[in-house]
């Protein structure tokens, strides 16, 4: 049976990436392409790269329009999905939210960081965090999945083997992350104009003010079995796609790079979308461009007894649309690679 898919927010960068990837999915069909800005227009007219690949017309993503969908992806600004979710679930559909409304478990934390009252706190408690490498079995039985943010995906996958094995201290963890400009979305924003970002490089939302901070800490606390606080500094770099996150961890005892590479390989054995590099080799963003892969490399600094872990993803794929489809595959009992293995990487 073909999975009937609805997308609310189909014409933003993340939404159109969902459309692109689902067009090659053998078990799914997009039947509702919801958009506020392009209702009545063919998506291929808005995004010409989709010509001859999709035949979809933008429409309102109303509860009535989405009622016949088996699964709905929401790629909306925070605050909007919480209003739509009850109707989608009541109609028997499943929902995967690529926004922020169902990522955090703590309502108070959500309201503090996003400065909005959460109108569906009961669903917030029900939602499953959609990072398959860590929460796969819970995702399989979910009605509602909070798809992780792009930075939290890269950071969590860099940290998971170390924290679960208990080989690093839980204090003093630092993440220094760089993102391409598409992470800021498609809307008009002076900060991402060509003349502002070209040949430029800047940090933003530093010192614990970025909204992905509590999401990173939530996952790392799960892994460590105790509260974890991190220092997270994001940067904007003049490229279209990609995230490179560097994690700094203090080792509890002396370990070699080779030993920790073995630890990572054992932890991610059988994971179709995590590729651990051999000792002495570090990944680059270009090597995952357009794909659902997370590539990881690491090196021990014996002088400081730290291990540095480099994690790279495509922010629009493993950091958003690809991971959402990976979650959809789990929800419907499909191999989680379905429709994703032909999606890159594109190089150079």
Swiss-Prot record:
<comment type="similarity">
    <text>Belongs to the NAGSA dehydrogenase family. Type 1 subfamily.</text>
</comment>
<dbReference type="GO" id="GO:0006526">
    <property type="term" value="P:L-arginine biosynthetic process"/>
</dbReference>
<keyword id="KW-0055">Arginine biosynthesis</keyword>
<dbReference type="InterPro" id="IPR000534">
    <property type="entry name" value="Semialdehyde_DH_NAD-bd"/>
</dbReference>
<dbReference type="Pfam" id="PF22698">
    <property type="entry name" value="Semialdhyde_dhC_1"/>
</dbReference>
<comment type="pathway">
    <text>Amino-acid biosynthesis; L-arginine biosynthesis; N(2)-acetyl-L-ornithine from L-glutamate: step 3/4.</text>
</comment>
<feature type="active site">
    <location>
        <position position="150"/>
    </location>
</feature>
<protein>
    <recommendedName>
        <fullName>N-acetyl-gamma-glutamyl-phosphate reductase</fullName>
        <ecNumber>1.2.1.38</ecNumber>
    </recommendedName>
</protein>
<comment type="function">
    <text>Catalyzes the NADPH-dependent reduction of N-acetyl-5-glutamyl phosphate to yield N-acetyl-L-glutamate 5-semialdehyde.</text>
</comment>
<keyword id="KW-0028">Amino-acid biosynthesis</keyword>
<keyword id="KW-0521">NADP</keyword>
<dbReference type="GO" id="GO:0051287">
    <property type="term" value="F:NAD binding"/>
</dbReference>
<dbReference type="GO" id="GO:0070401">
    <property type="term" value="F:NADP+ binding"/>
</dbReference>
<dbReference type="InterPro" id="IPR036291">
    <property type="entry name" value="NAD(P)-bd_dom_sf"/>
</dbReference>
<dbReference type="GO" id="GO:0005737">
    <property type="term" value="C:cytoplasm"/>
</dbReference>
<dbReference type="Pfam" id="PF01118">
    <property type="entry name" value="Semialdhyde_dh"/>
</dbReference>
<keyword id="KW-0560">Oxidoreductase</keyword>
<keyword id="KW-0963">Cytoplasm</keyword>
<dbReference type="GO" id="GO:0003942">
    <property type="term" value="F:N-acetyl-gamma-glutamyl-phosphate reductase activity"/>
</dbReference>
<dbReference type="InterPro" id="IPR050085">
    <property type="entry name" value="NAGSA_dehydrogenase"/>
</dbReference>
<dbReference type="InterPro" id="IPR000706">
    <property type="entry name" value="AGPR_type-1"/>
</dbReference>
<dbReference type="InterPro" id="IPR023013">
    <property type="entry name" value="AGPR_AS"/>
</dbReference>
């Amino acid at each position: 049976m073909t999975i009937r898919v609805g997308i609310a927010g189909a014409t933003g960068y993340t939404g159109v990436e969902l459309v692109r990837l689902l067009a090659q999915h053998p078990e799914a069909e997009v039947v509702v392409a919801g958009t506020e800005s392009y209702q009545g227009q063919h998506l291929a007219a808005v995004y010409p790269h989709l010509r001859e690949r999709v035949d979809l017309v933008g429409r309102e993503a109303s509860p009535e329009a989405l009622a016949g969908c088996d699964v709905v992806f929401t790629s909306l600004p925070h605050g909007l999905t919480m209003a739509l979710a009850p109707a989608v679930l009541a109609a028997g559909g499943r929902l995967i939210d690529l926004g922020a409304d169902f990522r955090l478990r703590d309502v108070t934390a959500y309201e503090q960081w996003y400065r909005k009252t959460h109108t569906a706190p009961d669903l917030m408690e029900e939602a499953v965090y959609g990072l398959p490498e860590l929460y796969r079995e819970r995702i399989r039985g979910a009605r509602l999945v909070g798809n992780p943010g792009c930075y939290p995906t890269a950071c969590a996958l860099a940290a998971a083997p170390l924290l679960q094995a208990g080989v690093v201290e839980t204090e003093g963890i630092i993440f220094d992350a760089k993102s391409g400009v598409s992470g800021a979305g498609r809307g008009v924003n002076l900060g991402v104009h060509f003349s502002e970002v070209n040949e430029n490089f800047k940090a933003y939302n530093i010192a614990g003010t970025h909204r992905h901070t509590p999401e990173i800490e939530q996952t790392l606390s799960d892994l460590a079995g105790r509260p974890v606080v991190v220092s997270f500094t994001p940067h904007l770099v003049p490229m279209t796609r990609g995230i490179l996150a560097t994690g700094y961890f203090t080792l509890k005892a002396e370990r070699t790079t080779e030993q920790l590479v073995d630890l990572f390989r054992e932890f991610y054995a059988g994971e179709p979308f995590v590729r651990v590099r051999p000792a002495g080799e570090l990944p680059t963003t270009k090597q995952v461009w357009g794909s659902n892969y997370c590539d990881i490399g690491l090196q021990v600094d014996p002088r400081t007894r730290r291990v540095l872990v480099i994690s790279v993803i495509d922010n629009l794929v493993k950091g958003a649309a690809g991971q959402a489809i990976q979650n959809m595959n789990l929800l419907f009992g499909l191999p989680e690679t379905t429709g994703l293995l032909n999606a890159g990487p594109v190089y150079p």
